[in-house]
A protein has these predicted regions:
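C-terminal non-catalytic regions of proteins with extracellular/luminal or membrane-system context
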Residues: 1-283
């Protein structure tokens, strides 16, 4: 869980009358690289998982909107209509490892497939902006095997999740998270860059002779790292939110100083101070 403004997530199934499920990965199963032993006919898509939760009480309005690679925007109108008819919208975008997905014939991620840009491919950015423009609450779920440079989405979309390639039960697992049966607890194992030009992106930049410059510049006063942006990631290594809160206390180490190859043993007291069950990756 990368972002969750105003606690939009988890969704309360009892308060919803309708939900829009939109995007090129909404009715798709992404098995991920080196999983060709799975039969692509099996598995649960996000759309199927959400419909299972919705039952007969919540209307599910589905629209693909666009494909992962084509610039064709003709399906966006249908996606906007689905959003306008719904209480909340869940967008499933991202990438594909084609041979290991259900239907796709083109890869945008995986071994042997490199892109020269880290923005979302095809008409996906246009789809996201069109759905956001309806004014309905929007949740963006990235089903992908890599990070994306999505500064506009970070600024304008209230809730963002990354599911990666979750396998044949991906639809059930993401529905459980969206509706609060399970609290997300994952942490990023790499950073999300601001743009393709921000690579490499990491937190521990070496200090230069000019010091640290973490603020974006302007046309009148250019910055000294990246001229018009700061050299910090959208989300850093280790970032990850959940639906509850935790309190760290009584930090103890087994000694006061360490040599280079020593093992550091640390003990803490960890308390769930929120109202939901949850897991915490201590860091």
């Amino acid at each position: 869980l990368l972002k969750n403004d105003r606690q939009l997530l988890p969704l309360s199934i009892g308060k919803l009358k309708s939900i829009a499920v939109i995007g090129p990965n909404a009715d798709q199963i992404q098995f991920g690289d080196y999983t060709w032993t799975r039969d692509s006919r099996f598995g649960v898509t996000p759309l199927q998982g959400i419909r299972k939760w919705a039952g007969t009480n919540v209307k599910v309005n589905y629209a693909k909107g666009c494909s992962l690679v084509s610039m064709d925007e003709s399906g966006i109108r249908q996606a906007v209509e689905a959003a306008e008819q719904s209480d909340v919208c869940v967008l499933f975008c991202g990438s594909a490892s084609a041979a290991l997905a259900r239907d796709y014939k083109s890869s945008t991620c995986g071994e042997g497939f490199d892109l020269n840009d880290l923005t979302l491919t095809g008409a996906q950015p246009a789809l996201i902006k069109a759905v956001q423009a309806t004014g309905k609450p929007v949740i963006l779920v990235l089903i992908t095997g890599k990070p994306f440079a999505i500064p506009w989405e970070k600024k304008n979309i209230p809730a963002i999740l990354v599911q990666w390639y979750a396998g044949e039960q991906s639809g059930n697992s993401i529905a459980d998270i969206l509706f609060g049966k399970v609290s997300p607890s994952g942490r990023l194992t790499f950073s999300f860059p601001e743009s393709t030009g921000h690579l490499p992106v990491f937190y521990n930049h070496l200090r230069s002779d000019r010091g640290f410059y973490k603020s974006p510049g302007s046309y009148d006063s250019p910055g000294r790292d990246y001229v018009f942006s700061a050299p910090v990631p959208l989300w850093s290594f280790g970032h990850g939110l959940t639906y509850t809160t935790f309190e760290y206390s009584n930090l103890q180490t087994d000694r006061t100083s360490y040599l280079l190859n020593d093992t550091v043993h640390v003990r803490i007291d960890l308390k769930n101070t929120g109202k939901r069950e949850g897991k915490e990756v201590v860091q």
